[in-house]
Amino acid sequence: MNRLVLIALTLIFLVSCEDEKQMMLIPEGKFTLGLNPQSTILQFMSEKTSALNAQPEQQYFLEAFYIDQFEVTYEEFMKFKPQAQYPIRQMHLPVRGVSWYEADAYCHWIGKRLPMEYEWEKAARGSDNRLFVWGNDFEKGTANFGKQVQPVNALKGDVSRYSIWGMNGNVSEWTSSWYQPYPESVLQDKNYGKKFKVTRGGSIHKREHGFLQQFAMLPYRNFSPPEMRFWDTGFRCAKSATRRGQRDAGPKVQ
């Protein structure tokens, strides 16, 4: 069978891990990482400095990996932390208010890991350099930037080309990556180093900003102290795609 056809067929199948949660295969290959400073959407905004850490735009190669189709819910997280008490009505919502350490521990407990920052961006943007999961033009109401968190499968418009839900809005997500400069970046940022973990994706919190379009862009990078908990931040898990069905030896944190 033609290799490209095989890859295409593989993408339509869901993968189950130890927790039987649906995962999607993101194939190996290059994708567009980062943001072009000449991007049309930035030219109409006055606050451009927060996008400097996502430059320069470049082609970046990643090995194949799996990523959860949906964010981890309260119901799933309570299996890991049964002492946590959440209202029944929240069970189908993405868990939030968990620290990076708690998110990381959950993913390892379930036999997975947090996605690296670059993995998250590829799963969200695909290979065609789009700024939002639906394209390059901001569409208000397509993703959740409202007042309330919604179920992980609520918005059919907020689905990437790899069938990953909720990457543009609802809650931001922890990644495994430290906040570091991109390859070939000339930006000097005092926050670079192993102090903050990168979070990705828009959230209901971003509606309070006047530059919602910029903060909602998939290349946008945010960062937070790993020990902190935020009411608009959750997570999903990932797993390396191993050859011949061999189990992943463990995460390689960026």
Region spans (language model):
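Functional-site microenvironments in short loops/helix caps that host divalent-cation chemistry
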Residues: 26, 32, 37-38, 86-222, ...
